[in-house]
Curated annotation (Swiss-Prot):
This is Mitochondrial import receptor subunit TOM20 homolog B. Central component of the receptor complex responsible for the recognition and translocation of cytosolically synthesized mitochondrial preproteins. Together with tom22 functions as the transit peptide receptor at the surface of the mitochondrion outer membrane and facilitates the movement of preproteins into the tom40 translocation pore. GO terms for molecular function: mitochondrion targeting sequence binding. Keywords: Membrane, Mitochondrion, Mitochondrion outer membrane, Phosphoprotein, Protein transport, Transmembrane, Transmembrane helix, Transport.
Length: 146
């Protein structure tokens, strides 16, 4: 019995210390005069990184016309960049197009027939990450609405 009560006391004491630690650093953070500036800078960097990834100009996935326009633009940009030899950016644009495509399997089959195997392999490796970023970007925009 004695071991059980002492472990409860230790757990309670640990929890109290943790809460105190959180409160201390929260107050320290809020009283920092540069906190808002640091927060603005961090948000600015995140926005710049998102724009660099091409996700800030994602269409509203509920607007079929905007999605179709985005899809066609991404395919065209991807093809142009691949023709210029910029495989990395070209594949990025093609993965954006695949991510918003209504029938991605058919598009992948067409791309597999038309793209050189190394470029198609690069496309396949980037697909999961771009799809995940689009899903997270869409959920962020849904959170902004609420």
């Amino acid at each position: 019995m004695m071991g059980g009560s002492s472990s409860r006391i230790a757990a309670g004491l640990g929890a109290a210390l943790f809460v105190g630690y959180c409160i201390y650093f929260d107050r320290k953070r809020r009283s920092d005069p540069n906190y808002k500036n640091k927060l603005r800078e961090r948000r600015k960097k995140q926005k710049a990184a998102q724009e660099k990834a091409g996700l800030s100009r994602l269409p509203d996935l509920k607007d079929a016309e905007a999605v179709q326009k985005f899809f066609l633009e991404e395919i065209q940009l991807g093809e142009e960049l691949l023709a210029q030899g910029d495989y990395e950016k070209g594949v990025d644009h093609l993965t954006n197009a695949i991510a918003v495509c209504g029938q991605p399997q058919q598009l992948l089959q067409v791309l597999q027939q038309t793209l050189p195997p190394p470029v198609f392999q690069m496309l396949l490796t980037k697909l999961p990450t771009i799809s995940q970023r689009i899903v997270s970007a869409q959920s962020i925009s849904d959170d902004d609405i609420e």
